[in-house]
Amino acid sequence: FDEVGEPGEFFTRQDGTSGFGDIRLIGKYALWVSTKHLLVGGLGVKTPTGEFKLLDSEGAINEPTIMPGTGSWDAIVSAYYDYQVMPHQLDVFLSSSYQINTENDLNYKFGNTLLVNAGTSYLIAVKNPATISLQVNMRHAPRDEFNGEEVPSTGGKWVYLTPGVKVDVSSGTALYTHVQLPIYQFVNEENLVPRYGLIIGVSHAF
C-alpha cells in the first residue's frame, strides 16, 4: 500500500472487508473490594488472529484501517472503578484502557489507543433481574505510522453516548444490548466514521 491513507481515494463496496478479528486476552485482579467500592486492574495482550492482508478490487492490499485484524502483537493495560450508590441496585463507574501497539510485518503501526468510559446502571426488576445503563465512551488515537512516517487520514477523537439493557435469563447467564450514538467525532483529514453502533451479546459467570 504505497499510497496508504491518501485523501481523495475512491472506494467501492468490493473494497470492503469482513472476517474474524483479533483476539484480546486480559487478566484482571480485584485490588479493592468492599460493600460500596470495587477497584480492578488488568493486563493483557491483543493477538494477531485477524486477517490483515486482504486484497481490494484492484488486487492490491486493502486499506489497513478497514481490515479485520492489525497483524501485530499489542499490550493492554486497564483499570476499572465502581461505586455502589445503592448497593446491588444503583452504581456509577469509571474505566480506562490503553493499548500499546507494535509494528506488523508490513511495516505498519496503528496508533496507541486510549479508551475512557464513565456511566451508571440501575436494577429495575428483582424477580426477573433487568438492568438499564447509560455510558459516555471516549476514544483517542494518534496517527498510524507506515515505514516510520505518519499516515494521513488516520487517528482522531471520538465520543459516544451509549444506552443499554441487560436481562438475566438464568443463574449466571444474561443477555445484553447497547446502542452507541456518536456525539463528537474528529478525524484527521478524511476518514470513515460510524453513524451508530449496535452491540448484542451473552455473558456467563462461572
Ranges and model annotations:
Residues 105-206:
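Outer membrane beta-barrel transmembrane domains
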Residues 1-111:
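Outer-membrane pore/translocation modules
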